[in-house]
């Protein structure tokens, strides 16, 4: 399993044959040696919203987007919101920017996505906002071997972290870069790394609560036009679970099968 490198020391040296090499001392204590002749460029990145004290894996979706993953209890979750624009079989998901068209999906039961404020720069790190028809579609929007979690699977996550009264804080990234001025109770001790990416309203099709709230779809339907979601906010450590109509715009976190 690939891992995200969160800390390393890079040194240039010579091998026994006199070849220039790069010594990479990883934060797990191991040494990786790479000949400089094999290196075209070096890119160092640190996802500051992750928990640097935990080990992350990776998963790649059907569009080639790679996400960190984290084991929490017996479950393995994506540690970022989904960014794909297709279902797992390659079928495209509509990008709906117009608020009226966004609301009208209830009459057609059509899956759709949008960026917050229709601004593609929010794709990373916040992800795409999807409607509920995407989350419940049998074609599966998650990568192969992963799925949109059910209400009960979210309950399992919350219970492992101490219950709905405190689990939200353990899911939220720390600080106020991605949560505005409050982020009360945000510890990210789980490594889930939730960010305050906002919502798309199912009442007017507009965008609200950026840096203040994050909602995720479950695959558990209430009716053919509504489903359960889970949510965290900047004002406390709670995890909220409730139902909403499928023309709301929420994020998706995938769970390994």
Residue ranges of each PLM-predicted region?
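Short N-terminal segments immediately surrounding and downstream of signal-peptide cleavage
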Residues: 20-35, 58-62
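Generic structural signal for beta-strand residues in well-ordered domains
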Residues: 11-17, 32, 141, 185
């Amino acid at each position: 399993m690939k891992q995200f490198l969160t800390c390393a020391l890079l040194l240039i040296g010579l091998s026994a044959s006199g070849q220039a090499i790069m010594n990479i001392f990883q934060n797990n204590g191991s040494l990786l040696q790479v000949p400089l002749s094999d290196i075209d460029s070096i890119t160092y990145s640190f996802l500051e919203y992750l928990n640097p004290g935990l080990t992350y894996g990776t998963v790649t979706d059907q569009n080639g987007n790679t996400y960190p993953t984290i084991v929490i209890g017996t479950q393995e979750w994506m540690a970022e919101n989904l960014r794909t624009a297709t279902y797992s079989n390659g079928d495209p998901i509509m990008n709906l920017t117009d608020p009226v068209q966004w609301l009208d999906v209830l009459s057609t039961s059509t899956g759709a996505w949008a960026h917050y404020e229709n601004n593609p720069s929010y794709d990373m790190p916040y992800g795409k906002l999807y409607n509920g028809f995407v989350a419940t579609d049998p074609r599966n929007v998650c990568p192969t071997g992963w799925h949109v979690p059910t209400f009960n699977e979210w309950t399992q996550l919350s219970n492992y972290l101490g219950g709905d009264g405190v689990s939200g804080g353990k899911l939220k990234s720390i600080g106020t870069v991605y949560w505005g001025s409050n982020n009360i109770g945000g510890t990210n001790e789980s490594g889930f790394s939730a960010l305050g990416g906002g919502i798309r309203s199912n009442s007017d099709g507009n965008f609200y609560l950026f840096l203040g709230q994050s909602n995720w779809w479950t695959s558990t339907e209430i009716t053919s036009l509504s489903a359960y979601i889970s949510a965290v906010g900047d004002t406390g450590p709670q995890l909220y679970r409730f139902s909403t109509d499928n023309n709301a715009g929420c994020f998706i976190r995938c769970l390994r099968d």
